[in-house]
Amino acid sequence: MAQSLALALDVPETTGDEGLEPSPYEESEVHDSFHQLIQEQSLRVAEEGLELLPLGLGRGDQTLPGLEGAPALSSATLRILASMPSRTIGRSRGAIISQYYNRTVRLRRRSSRPLLGNVVPSARPSLRLYDLELDSTILEEDEKRSLLVKELQGLSAAQRDHMVRNMPLSLGEKRCLREKSWSPKGKRRHLQGRSGAFSCCSRLRYTCMLALHSLGLALLSGLYAARPWRYALKQIGGQFGSSVLSYFLFLKTLLAFNALMLLPLLAFLVGVQAAFPPDPAGPVPTFSGLELLTGGGRFTHTVMYYGYYSNSTLSPSCDAPREGGQCSPRLGSLPYNMPLAYLFTMGATFFLTCIILVYSMSHSFGESYRVGSTKGIHALTVFCSWDYKVTQKRASRVQQDSICTQLKELLAEWHLRKRPRSVCGQLRQVVVLGLGWLLCLGSTMGCTVAVLTFSEVMIQRPASGGQGVEALALPLVVSVLNLGASYLFRGLATLERHDSPVLEVYMAICRNLILKMAVLGVLCYHWLGRRVATLQGQCWEDFVGQELYRFMVVDFIFMLLDSLFGELVWRLISEKKLKRGQKPEFDIARNVLDLIYGQTLTWLGVLFSPLLPAVQILRLLFLFHIKKASLMANCQAPRRPWLASHMSTVFLTLLCFPSFLGAAVFLCYAVWQVRPSSTCGPFRTLNTMYEAGTVWVRRLEHAGSGASWLPWLHHFLVENTFFLFLASALLLAVIYFNIQVVKGQRKVICLLKEQIRNEGEDKIFLINKLHSVYEEEGRSRPGRTQDATEPPAWHEDGGDQKEPCNPRSP
């Protein structure tokens, strides 16, 4: 066997570039000496290149089509490829220790302390900073370790810990290096810690710290376990796919929105009014249980509704009310003004909700519309999706189902692109879609006219104050029409036979959205345009709040009935009578629109019932568990799986623009234009609710208190329309800049992918050149006769074409 030789590169190091990595120009001498290195490497044992040799095929194996055109590389080329840095990373601890020894030398040579972020945890040996050893017997590993330990002892504690932490070694090696590099003082401190030589105060301090840390971990684990979606979301995503999972994720988002809305209402309105309850105007009715359906009765005399809140300042002692029903402020103090608190709390709550909603929508847009290459995505899903930290059998089963469902969705999407529809089929599809839309719009118009007619009939009847069962008539009619129209739309979608299940869901969402928004528009006109005029001398705000409460309760009951009869009964009929193994599918469009409809009712009624977000939270929690149980027991996974990559963005967009924007317009009209009731509520003595802020500013100007800047702030920020336009422009600018940032990130991703592709082509070119050089040397050697045939080129798989990277395509 030939003796292994060592090549020492004598490249002088100047003082000007100490601590810096060599540039490509400075390493030209190193690259020029590669020819000598290749000649010496050719003398090594041939077994080092065995790992790149193709394995022999077994008896029953078949030749893969991709291996027929594989290049026949020589043994020398295989040995060179086997010694490449990318194939030797992590093999030689001596090389790693030698590399970090040179790094510590550079750290000590620097005049100033370096930035820790500049240290790259690479395992490739440097060709410039130490001798290139090809034989491990030249420098022993122990000698390298001792040199590294000496250099580590000369570093500061922070630099030493950071250097050892980033070494690509095992934990035992790192622990050994850290212990050997300790100073004598550090060793004594470590021995004292292990022997327990601590004072009583130190022991008490450490015990308290450990107890607090354990308590915090226990509280966090308890909060994590108390979440209803802790395990259910993974189970749903694994069994039913991302399309059904998007519904439950949207429900979780609505829970967060209502919780954020409820907190300021409880802190500044409900809690304060409950601490200072007003005197009852008459006898308070007893609780009968019917209030849970109608929202009237005993609930009318609680903090549930607008009429219970007082129109005076809340304090333990208050002077007689002056003009506008307000108490005069005492010297040097500003009492709690309930009308002002009611108005500003509602405004701040809606403004905060708007900001969070717009941010969530933009963030979801950036997450879902990122650049994703479909080339090799199936292989990545198969080989790179498993989480090896999962050890429990139940969790591993869920992860297995999730990967299987994800593969089905990817294959279904790929198969859909490979099967375009013919021209005749497209014309037929357009005609069927046109007829379907005409029927949907006609049914929507019919439902709207029916709701308007029935609401006029209800106006002609005497108002019952929301205490009888007859008050549930209008919510029942609206819920029946919504449910019947949704089933009609679903039947039309079945007849239309869409090629894409995503398009089918989007069509159903648009049709249900048009229906529900039209019905809600008629109801808003009924409440503010008709009911206010007929309820003169009564508290119309309480009536509107009770109506919205009844709509939420009846809608919740119909959702339960739909889960019971629409899913459970249909499953029993399909399995018992029809003898089919198929179960009904989960209707994503109708269930999502039910959530948006319920959230719109909450936003419409929060001004007249401050505790309506709490009712919505309870409603969503019940819906989560009921829908999950019904889904697991009565539904099956979609027969045509599809990847819901943009569904969260679509849901948040629909929640923002038609739902939240419409509710904001409704409430702004109620605050600025409609006269409040003169018998109840915090604005009973005012012409509009907005005048509460004007009256408060006027009182501050007359009082001449130290808060004289508040009237100026109210004038320029509230009454001046320029600030409103400026805030709207800033919000639109933030949305625009966020969209541009997302587009820029997608373009950068495209450029990086193109750069990676070019680097791969460069490496293929160099390998081909290296193979050609060895073939020429083999032919030129004496004593060998070989046909002068050109070696085959190392190439990529010819079946895959370069996929164009288009950053504008979602």
Swiss-Prot record:
The chain crosses the membrane at residues 206-226, 254-274, 339-359, 430-450, 469-489, 505-525, 553-573, 604-624, 650-670, 722-742. The modification Omega-N-methylarginine is found at R93. Pfam families: TMC. The keyword Transmembrane applies. The lineage of its organism: Eukaryota, Metazoa, Chordata, Craniata, Vertebrata. It is found in: Endoplasmic reticulum membrane. Acts as a regulatory protein involved in the regulation of numerous cellular processes. Together with its homolog TMC8/EVER2, forms a complex with calcium-binding protein CIB1 in lymphocytes and keratynocytes where TMC6 and TMC8 stabilize CIB1 and reciprocally. Together with TMC8, also forms a complex with and activates zinc transporter ZNT1 at the ER membrane of keratynocytes, thereby facilitating zinc uptake into the ER. Down-regulates the activity of transcription factors induced by zinc and cytokines. Residues 15-26 have a biased composition (Acidic residues). Residues 1-26, 775-810 are annotated as: Disordered. It is a multi-pass membrane protein. Residues 1-205, 275-338, 451-468, 526-552, 625-649, 743-810 are lumenal. The modification Phosphothreonine is found at T88, T104. This is Transmembrane channel-like protein 6. Glycans are attached at N102, N311. Interacts with TMC8. Interacts and forms a complex with TMC8 and CIB1; the interaction stabilizes each component of the complex. Interacts and forms a complex with TMC8 and SLC30A1/ZNT1; the interaction regulates zinc transport into the ER. Disruption phenotype: Knocktout mice breed and grow normally. No major defect in T cell subset numbers or function. Decrease in CIB1 protein level in thymocytes and lymph node cells. In knocktout mice, heat and mechanical hyperalgesia in chronic pain are alleviated. In knocktout mice, DRG neurons exhibit a hyperpolarized resting membrane potential compared with WT neurons. Small to medium DRG neurons show reduced excitability compared with WT neurons. Residues 227-253, 360-429, 490-504, 574-603, 671-721 are cytoplasmic. Residues 793-810 have a biased composition (Basic and acidic residues). Belongs to the TMC family. The modification Phosphoserine is found at S136. It comes from the Eukaryota. It comes from Mus musculus (Mouse). Keywords: Endoplasmic reticulum, Glycoprotein, Membrane, Methylation, Phosphoprotein, Transmembrane, Transmembrane helix. PANTHER family: TRANSMEMBRANE CHANNEL-LIKE PROTEIN 6, TRANSMEMBRANE CHANNEL-RELATED. Widely expressed. Highly expressed in thymus, lung and spleen. Expressed in lymphocytes and peripheral lymphocytes. Expressed in small and medium dorsal root ganglion (DRG) neurons. One of its GO terms (cellular component) is plasma membrane.
